[in-house]
Regions:
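Short N-terminal edge-element motif at the start of the domain
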Residues: 1-46
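Long acidic/polar interaction regions in large eukaryotic complex-forming proteins
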Residues: 60-134
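A eukaryote-biased signal for long
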Residues: 103-177
Length: 177
């Protein structure tokens, strides 16, 4: 068996906003660690830790790939929309109720009070509680009309925004062909 010492090609960018910067309120520090040999990005920050591996690609340098990806692509790779947004869920459910359910269920004359009752569902409710409350308020509502809106976690959105605004321009500058 042969043991070989490998000195990996890793590049790290550290970002620490100044106390007066707007970003300081959402993220006080973040490190973007690019493992160029394996095509992996690790993001460590006080807004959360995220990681994704693209794998090695002999046809494109990893830093070139990182210089050209867009934020929504990166966000989708490092996270998933799993945070329940009850405010947006209420709005979409009320829209669905007005568009599809009011005539079908014969509740057009009570629509204003029904929508008001949906708006008053506790803003700290879970998605399951929200769903059950809407079903209680509007018996017979089609389950597909009860919209459960999920978003990416705040921390993931923050580190991707910082990547696009500060790190990616630096990568382009440092690795311009």
């Amino acid at each position: 068996m042969k043991v070989e010492r490998i000195i990996p090609r890793t590049i790290t960018y550290r970002l620490v906003p100044d106390k007066g910067d707007d970003e300081c309120n959402s993220c006080m520090w973040v490190r973007y660690i690019f493992d160029c040999d394996n095509g992996r990005l690790n993001i460590n920050s006080d807004a959360g830790d995220y990681s994704y591996g693209w794998g090695y690609n002999e046809h494109e340098d990893f830093m070139h790939l990182m210089s050209r990806i867009n934020g929504s692509y990166l966000l989708n790779k490092i996270s998933s929309p799993h945070v329940f947004n009850i405010g947006k869920s209420k709005v979409k459910t009320i829209e669905n109720l007005e568009l599809y359910e009011a005539d079908y269920l014969g509740i057009k004359n009570r629509l204003d009070s029904i929508c008001e009752e949906i708006e008053y569902i506790d803003s700290l409710s879970s998605e399951e509680t929200f769903f059950k409350e809407v079903e209680r308020i509007v018996p017979g509502i089609d389950w597909e009309s009860v919209e459960i809106v999920k978003e990416y976690p705040y921390g993931a959105r923050v580190v991707v925004d910082l990547f696009e605004r500060y790190i990616q321009p630096k990568i382009r500058e440092d690795f311009a062909s």
